[in-house]
A protein has these predicted regions:
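Beta-strand/beta-sandwich contexts
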Residues: 5-42, 85-113
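Immunoglobulin-like IPT/TIG beta-sandwich domains and homologous Ig-like subdomains
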Residues: 24-86
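Protease zymogen maturation seam
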Residues: 98-115, 173-238, 250-252, 346-348
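Subtilisin-like serine protease catalytic core
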Residues: 111, 222-318, 329-332, 343, ...
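Surface-exposed aromatic
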Residues: 148-165, 188, 192
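Extracellular S/T/G-rich loop segment that most often corresponds to the catalytic His/Ser-adjacent loop
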Residues: 243-245, 251, 403-482, 486
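Substrate-binding/access-modulating region of protease and related hydrolase catalytic domains
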Residues: 309-410, 459-471
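C-terminal subdomain of the subtilisin-like protease fold in secreted/lumenal serine endopeptidases
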Residues: 331-338, 412-415, 484-558
Length: 558
């Protein structure tokens, strides 16, 4: 049967949705969609359940261009329908933060052997200036062009008239001396070594055992029974997951098609193709059918929107652009299962970290960008919580000159380390039940730890890393906020640590050594008891107890 005659069964997928044309335009927005499984019949496109007029949609092969003349409406899910089939729904943001990714001929190798953007940089303009006006002035002065923006942060992306890295670096230095420029952000990328971790052979693991260490099933049972019984008016929560996409052919995502009913867990994402992709695993911990935490809350669930987005593929800058849009679209919890190390960062054994590294030039720009993001978050959206992975360099998570973004000290950033089941046959509440994941970054900037190893039902081997511990914590936080939306980020952190199980030995409160994982449990987190056996140990997520404290917090003034 020819795909050209009509769409093959269940192959309609939106693989890409990005701003195109003039991304700075406030009068009209153009969006380019790359779609598979279209066939020859004209598709119907829906935004928020409303059919878009046919004249707003142009097709060229597998690419569709959507033009919105009055882009002032609310952000909403978008999907296609053809012959009774519905595609995966993708989140269409009406916010204005969009950056451009470099093409294959717009990158080069720098002296550190890292791939760096050649002619695309971003400038962070001092807040007392009109950002767009100043960016255009600078662009005119240097023969550049403004092509992207993260307007709330006063960040503007420029395309430079350069042909090699010598010319680029010279222009970056000159731009950095402009009075109005706070920082110039250079984008880099580098390969991540194979699986997250250090390539050791993994012991045979059982998914249920790993998550039992955080009382995953106990938490599901508690929510399903306690919430209806106590008549708590739980509220829907929107979660943002900074990832490329999700494999909608994977068993846990096959049911997420087209419209999603109010009160359910909904997933909005580009189709990622690979069932073993990073985004599929991370999003699956939130929302995979029969496996994900939020999807398993059942009839008691108020409904969770899980929005998976990374803007364009323009690296860290795109991650921040997507995060800004999502926060403006009402996201309360952001899942950042990503992070970077500076070239030269060393692990706890003194060896150089060789995964996810960036040059000093790139790191200094990223640090300024992230600082601006968290300042904006505190000023405009103080109720939003960012949950970030500590990293897998077996290094220190809180050294700000070597690790981003987990080194930032702000109440709105929760940092998550990783543990795995130990060989000891002891109860779940025994500190020896788990051990520190050998590759997990450590130190007192890590707030809590969670299971780092994941083994989906159809996987031949486990996937491990703090990337997979992070969504366990983020999903717990989302459920806590559904129970008590008034919780502040500082209160959420306090409840997570008060409720935590422990792992490891008691610390001596001196400099972190290789065995410590998180900030030590303090007497104030154990009711002021100086003889509590948990004191000085690292914190391990207890999902059920965290939900219980969230319920109690509704009636307590702290």
């Amino acid at each position: 049967m020819s795909a050209g005659l009509h769409a093959a069964p269940d192959t309609l997928r939106i693989q890409q949705l990005q701003r195109c044309g003039n991304v700075l335009s406030t009068e009209r927005q153009q969006w380019c969609l790359r779609v598979t499984g279209l066939g020859e019949q004209a598709p119907t496109l829906k935004v928020g359940g409303v059919t878009v007029p046919a004249e707003a949609l142009k097709r060229q092969g597998d690419t569709l261009t959507l033009t919105l003349e009055h882009p002032s409406g609310p952000s909403a899910p978008l999907w296609l329908e053809v012959n009774g089939q519905a595609s995966n729904p993708v989140w269409l943001t009406r916010q204005r933060s969009h950056v451009v990714a470099a093409g294959p001929d717009e990158v080069a190798k720098n002296m550190d052997g890292l791939t760096t953007y050649l002619n695309l940089v971003s400038v962070l303009i001092e807040e007392r200036y009109d950002g767009l006006q100043e960016a255009r002035r600078i662009a005119s002065k240097y023969g550049a062009q403004v092509v992207g923006a993260i307007a709330p942060l006063n960040v503007y992306q420029l395309r430079l008239p350069v042909n090699d890295l010598v010319q680029r670096d010279a222009m970056v230095l000159r731009m950095g001396t402009e009075v109005s420029v706070d920082a110039v952000i250079v984008e880099e990328s580098a390969p991540e070594r194979g699986e997250e971790g250090d390539g050791r052979g993994e012991p045979s693991i059982t998914q249920a055992d790993e998550w039992a260490a955080n009382r995953f099933m106990d938490a599901l049972y508690y929510f399903q029974r306690r919430i209806p019984a106590s008549r708590i008016p739980v509220q829907p929560v929107r979660v943002g997951v900074i990832e490329r996409g999700v494999a909608f052919d994977a068993p846990g995502f096959k049911r997420y098609r087209g419209a999603c009913k109010h009160g359910q867990t909904c997933v909005y994402a580009r189709d990622g193709g690979e069932s073993a992709s990073h985004g599929t695993h991370v999003a699956g911990i939130f929302a995979a059918q029969d496996e994900g935490f939020l999807a398993g809350l059942g009839k008691a669930s108020p409904g969770f929107d899980v929005i998976v987005d990374r803007n364009s593929d323009a690296g860290i800058t795109a991650n921040i652009a997507a995060s800004v849009n999502l926060v403006q679209d009402g996201v309360r919890v952001l899942n950042w299962s990503w992070g970077i190390h500076r070239v030269g960062a060393r692990n706890i054994k003194g060896d150089e970290v060789d995964s996810l590294v960036r040059s000093g030039l790139a790191m200094s720009g990223y640090e300024e960008l992230l600082e601006e993001f968290f300042l904006w978050l505190r000023a405009k959206h103080p109720d939003v919580i960012v949950v970030n992975s500590a990293g897998n360099g077996a290094s220190w998570s809180g050294t700000d000159e070597y690790r981003l973004p987990s080194s930032f000290v702000t109440e709105q950033l929760l940092v998550v380390g990783g543990h795995q089941r130990s060989e000891h046959a002891v109860p779940v509440n025994d500190p020896r039940h788990v051990r520190k994941r050998h590759s997990s970054n450590i130190d007192s900037r890590v707030d809590v730890s969670a299971a780092a190893c994941l083994r989906p039902a159809d996987a031949a081997k486990p996937h491990c890393g703090t990337s997979y511990a992070t969504p366990l914590v983020a999903a717990t936080v989302a459920a806590m906020l559904a129970i008590n939306p008034a919780l502040t980020p500082a209160q959420v952190r306090m409840l997570l640590r008060r409720s935590a199980l422990t792992l490891g030995d008691q610390q001596d409160f001196e400099a972190m050594d290789a065995e410590d994982l998180t900030a030590p449990i303090l007497p104030s987190e154990r009711g002021g008891r100086l003889d509590d056996p948990d004191l000085g140990r690292s914190a391990r997520l207890d999902m059920q107890r965290a939900l219980d404290l969230a319920v109690q917090s509704r009636d307590r003034v702290r």
